[in-house]
Amino acid sequence: MMNIDYSQFFHMLPEVTLTAVLVIVFIADLFSAAKPAESKPRKWFNPLVCILMLIHILINIFPVPAYETFGGMYATSHAIGVIKTILAFGTLIVFIQAREWLHSPDTCFKEGEFYILALSTLLGMNMMVSANHFLLFFLGLEMASVPMACLVAFDKYRHNSAEAGAKFILKATFSSGVMLFGISFLYGATGTLYFEDMMTRITATPLAIMGMVFFFSGLGFKISLVPFHFWTADTYQGAPTTVTGYLSVVSKGAAAFALCAILIKVFGSMALYWKYLLMVVIVMSITIANLFAIHQKDLKRFMAFSSISQAGYIMLAVIGDSAMGVTALTYYILVYVVANLAVFTIISSVEEHNGGNVKMDAYNGLYQTNPRLSFIMTIALFSLGGIPPFAGMFSKFFVFMAAANGAQITNTIGAWTYAVVFIALVNTVISLYYYLLIVKAMFIKHNDKPLPTFNAGINTKMALAVCTLGIAIFGVCSYVYDWIYAAVAM
């Protein structure tokens, strides 16, 4: 009989507490849910879930020291603890603002399922970022992808949600196959699936290079990098707005951090190859997404291309290939979480009070009837565009500095790195144009039938307050960046 050392689970505290939250939510839903025809909103259920998530965050806000367990397959560190806290924080914001949507007649009978699926997705992401072995990494990735597909198709009778779910499943299946193909090549080249062992054995052979390219391509689908982005706009448009917000920040942030860690851990000796590949993908992602975003008329499709562009900026930090680069990437994800979720919270609120309309024209003259929402939307868009003094400007600055620092360290591709940074700066200016199109619509354009004045729900106000404070404080308070840098440097 195999003896299990249960003390190992102490080093998996984020997963243990998250599993406890998941079990409590499941039991509470099981014993309180009514039949769909008789179902009424449970006013106590959302506060319970949010309080449990807050407790989970507070327990894990001080990351545990670096440690490997379960035969070296699972690894934790201060940096991994920070990214898990950020992902849980983003999930909490989504849960807060989801209350109004989940209490509608079409969804109130499956409120519990939403929380269970979202928590399962978060648990898979936690396993993915802590993986020190490709098997555990793949299991975590699929554990996150399957519940996410259910969330995308959650509102299957409205807004093309079923179509979006089908496209997401096809994308997930194809990308997983491509990734497994690459992992099999890497195993053939090194004879191991452990990250650290693979790092010492891997050399730039054709088999290893092909494995790296296939693995990068598979994960590129998850992050929505060009040219692996074709599913993004349709999925974002068809999924429920709350789910779209969750998919755009939490899922993307986890995959981006995991890719950064694997490129540095496993492919450190092949940095010259993956940096060239990454630079091409970054330029395409930022440029093509910006050009497509300018012509969008649907706000959720617009945010899809904005998300693709933001993914390019996030990957720019990976070129730094240092503690500064990982810090910039993590800080960018944190700022992106609060700014993007603020936008999607407003989109969800306007959609709810405007008959499901998410077209750009619906925001014409919004300032006249709903000035507070217009003001918060402007702050969030300015942060996404990198306009000072908001946090988005500092996140882009740190990303550019990390990439430039990487260029100084690596003379071989230094000139190319500076060129990519310059192109990213030019695209930042271009992105201001299409973000300001929404601001122009809200404050300047006239609307013969403007959206009536409405009072947003208390949960929407709470979510927007948290996001707005984050946009303001994360930029002004240097402690946040210092906290992340200290965790990464340990």
Specify the residue positions occupied by each region the protein language model found.
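Alpha-helical transmembrane segments of multi-pass membrane proteins predominantly involved
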Residues: M1-M490
